[in-house]
A protein has these predicted regions:
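Arg/Lys-rich, positively charged N-terminal/basic patches that mediate binding to nucleic acids
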Residues: 1-21
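A short, surface-exposed loop/turn module that caps and links secondary-structure elements
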Residues: 28-58
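Short, surface-exposed coil-to-beta transition loops
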Residues: 60-64
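Residues that recognize and position ribonucleotide moieties
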Residues: 3, 47, 87
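Short, charge- and proline-biased low-complexity linear segments
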Residues: 19-37, 91, 96-97
Length: 99
């Protein structure tokens, strides 16, 4: 099992949409299968996973951007956005995450 940490940006975004229970359910799934998300091309290893929200329909889901640091079992939850607000992470946002 991996350890999950959230960036401040991720926390602020996720708090707008998720309950504590939804957050824990998602994190448990990602920690048990850190390869669940698709690798984002030219991102240096960031992954994107789509997560549905109960009762919200297809457009009510969210996208999570995370980085899996395999050497030490750490997963960094980096970015969060609602599918109905944004389809993909912008290149400028991804560049900020990469540092």
């Amino acid at each position: 099992m991996y350890t999950i940490v959230e960036t401040e940006t991720f926390k602020k975004q996720a708090d707008k949409f998720w309950t504590t229970e939804e957050r824990l359910e998602c994190f448990t799934q990602i920690a048990s299968d850190p390869f669940i998300g698709d690798v984002i091309l030219k991102s240096g290893g960031f992954r994107k996973v789509r997560w549905s929200r109960a009762g919200m329909g297809k457009r009510g889901g969210v996208h999570l951007i995370y980085f899996n640091v395999l050497e030490d079992g750490l997963i960094v939850m980096s970015y969060f956005y609602a599918k109905n607000e944004q389809e993909n992470i912008l290149a400028s946002e991804l560049q900020k995450l990469k540092g």
